[in-house]
Amino acid sequence: SAAATPAEAVDGAELVITSLFGPDTVREVVIEPGLIPEGVSWADATTVSPTDAAAFAEAVPGYVHTPVVGSLPPAREGKLGVYVGGADASRRRTVSTVVAPWAAANPSRLKEVDTAAGAATGKLLANLALAVTIEGFKEALLLGQSQGLSEEQVVDMLGSTGLEFIVNMKKSFLLGERSVAPGDFTADAIAKDARLMLASAETDLPAVAAALASLEAQQEAGRGDEDFSTVVVNR
């Protein structure tokens, strides 16, 4: 049954699992009110920066970062990737056992990392790959279109290239076989993550910056709550 408040939800728990929209929400809901009882393990799947993850680990000794790679369809089938990061090996192993069903279809996709910040970095790397390849897919379509190729022809020509993964993931949206609303992984969500990447890097990330510009154009057009394939569909 649903609890009336977060405090009621965690009362008596041995392990608390959260998945929220970004680090600011984690601070508001969990850190500032001191939500996690002393001695209780806290597995948080929210996408945050490495700096945020390190701060949460310092604030809550039971913190284990458990970001996931994948969207709703693979989640329903136990096909997510999961990074489990924390300095306490015992807590990390316990949490790994609990979240193992998230990656049940491919257990090798569950990876333990010895710090929460390391797990956060892994998640940003995974989403960086999505951001820059959707930008590459968009630019490939623009190049092909400028030379008279159809969308179908560009999709076919991108087979067996470095963009094949993102093309196979998103071509059904591009070719009208699926609607971009509701989104599996929204433009708002990946734009948020791209900003975390840029803030976390100690150097310029021009490909990420280009991807973010495309995502922000979709947000400005009112399509932030659509699947991030809107970048190619509404290019």
Where does each model-flagged region fall?
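A general structural motif at alpha-helix termini
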Residues: 13, 60, 158-161, 215, ...
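Short, amphipathic C-terminal "tail helix"
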Residues: 229-235
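Rossmann-fold NAD(P) dinucleotide-binding segment
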Residues: 2-64
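Proline-centered loop/turn at the N-terminus of a beta-strand
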Residues: 41, 62, 81, 204-206
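Helical "substrate-binding/catalytic lid" subdomain
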Residues: 118-208, 212-229
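Rossmann-fold dinucleotide-binding core
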Residues: 31, 48-127
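Amphipathic alpha-helical hairpins
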Residues: 15, 21, 25, 51, ...
